[in-house]
Amino acid sequence: MGFRLPGIRKASFSANQASSKAVDVEKGYLAVYVGEKMRRFVIPVSYLNKPSFQDLLSQAEEEFGYHHPNGGLTIPCSEDVFQHITSFLN
């Protein structure tokens, strides 16, 4: 079960990666955690400059401050909303 969205890469874990805390992310990309299940998405850093994505970052700051439970950036919205917003950023 999978889907492909241009510009977004759903993180895949191998056995070795799952056991380590930090999983490599390609240069120019950023890992974020989204939804109740904290699904990991790898997005282009260029999204950080987009107003609609900055709204998500503001929500994350309001909810989590600068402490994110997974150690990475957590976006407080559903996966569907996240995918909808990011689909317009490509």
Swiss-Prot record:
Copy out the induction comment: By auxin.
Keyword Transmembrane in record: no
**Signal peptide limits:** none
Q: Answer whether the UniProt record assigns the keyword Cytoplasm to this protein.
A: no
Show the InterPro entries listed in the entry: SAUR_fam (IPR003676)
The processes (GO biological process) annotated in the record are: auxin-activated signaling pathway
Q: What does the UniProt keyword field contain?
A: Auxin signaling pathway
Similarity comment: family membership: Belongs to the ARG7 family.
Its name, as the record gives it, is Auxin-induced protein 6B
